[in-house]
């Protein structure tokens, strides 16, 4: 891809005329990092039937400007907030768990929310999965649709071998 603050294109009109279309200016970031051992990298797809599924990070009522609200024709006002001080420890713990071979798969939760990304993890591994929404962090008294489609930042779906449960949970 390209990193650019400007995205322009030309669309042909109904009568052959050309219309210049420009996206809003958008700041984009690219990052790189050294990986000490590429064999420790994990992918997003579920690996083995029976693996445990964890949701890391807090789900909040942040449906504003979400895919779900767009589908319903709403805009909403509770847009996802970025909370770096809250996310950093969770990211470090996840990195530690991956480095120690405890994580079978990991996938970020973003556009579309938990429901969309649980489906992606399951389909990626050609497996089904079972999720208990009462165990989703932050879910307390939230409606199921909020839990499933909130686009709260800083969250991950992680699958692990049941034999590694104790070691994984000790990290978190």
Regions found by a protein language model. Give the residues of each.
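Glycine-/charge-enriched secondary-structure boundary and capping motifs
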Residues: 6-8, 12-28, 75-76, 97-172
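Hydrophobic alpha-helical segments and helix-packing faces
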Residues: 83, 87, 111-114
């Amino acid at each position: 891809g390209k990193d650019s603050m400007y995205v322009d294109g030309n669309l042909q009109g109904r009568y052959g005329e050309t219309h210049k279309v420009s996206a809003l200016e958008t700041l984009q970031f690219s990052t790189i990092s050294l990986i000490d051992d590429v064999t420790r990298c994990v992918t997003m797809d579920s690996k083995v039937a029976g693996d445990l599924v964890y949701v890391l990070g807090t789900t909040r009522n942040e449906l504003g400007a979400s895919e779900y609200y767009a589908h319903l024709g709403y805009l909403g006002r509770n847009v996802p907030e970025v909370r770096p001080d809250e996310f950093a420890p969770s990211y470090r713990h996840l990195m530690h768990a991956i480095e120690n071979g405890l994580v079978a798969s990991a996938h970020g939760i973003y556009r579309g929310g938990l429901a969309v990304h649980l489906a992606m993890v399951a389909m990626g591994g050609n497996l089904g999965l079972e999720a208990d929404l009462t165990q989703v962090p932050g879910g307390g008294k939230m409606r199921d649709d909020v839990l499933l489609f909130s686009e709260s930042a800083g969250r991950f779906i992680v699958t692990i071998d049941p034999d590694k449960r104790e070691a994984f949970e000790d990290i978190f």
